């Protein structure tokens, strides 16, 4: 393989760039820096929201970041976002809310709101998520399921446009 043709390296954080303890090793940082010195752009693509990637940008300056499963891109100090339309998010969350004990999290530009407490993450717990959708731009809706059969039940009841 001719490495001189490589223009960019795009990596995930969790399970790829980071160790199991969520650290970035000195060796990895040195390797990324050597690639950059060869004119290669270093970027990350992650499901994490921007606020959860920022600690790693203090260890290494990434040329671009694709975060929140692609809902937000940060490149050269500029941000581009693809929000879920309010009506779509409202319809989706209302349909999900009809299922008792379904755990829902909304990711916005700056926060996460959930209808249940999540110990590992900083979230604002709020029973009714509709007012959040009305006032905030929603980047991502996460549905946390304990059982796979619940997913198939919920999917059958959702409009096809929401799959």
Give the ranges of each region predicted by the language model.
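A short local structural element in Rossmann-fold oxidoreductases
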Residues: 18, 54, 155
């Amino acid at each position: 393989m001719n490495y001189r043709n490589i223009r960019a390296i795009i990596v995930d954080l969790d399970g790829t760039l980071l160790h199991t303890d969520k650290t970035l090793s000195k060796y990895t940082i040195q390797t990324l820096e050597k690639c950059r010195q060869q004119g290669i752009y270093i970027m990350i693509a992650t499901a994490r929201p921007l606020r959860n990637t920022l600690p790693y940008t203090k260890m290494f300056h990434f040329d671009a970041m694709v975060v929140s499963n692609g809902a937000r891109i940060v490149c050269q100090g500029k941000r581009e976002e693809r929000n879920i339309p309010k009506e779509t998010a409202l319809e989706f969350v209302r349909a999900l809310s009809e299922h008792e004990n379904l755990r829902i999290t909304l990711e916005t530009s700056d926060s996460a709101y959930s209808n249940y407490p999540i110990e590992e993450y900083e979230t604002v717990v709020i029973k009714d998520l509709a007012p959040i959708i009305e006032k905030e731009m929603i980047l991502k809706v996460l549905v946390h399921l304990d059982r796979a059969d619940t997913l198939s039940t919920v999917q059958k009841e959702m409009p096809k446009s929401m799959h």
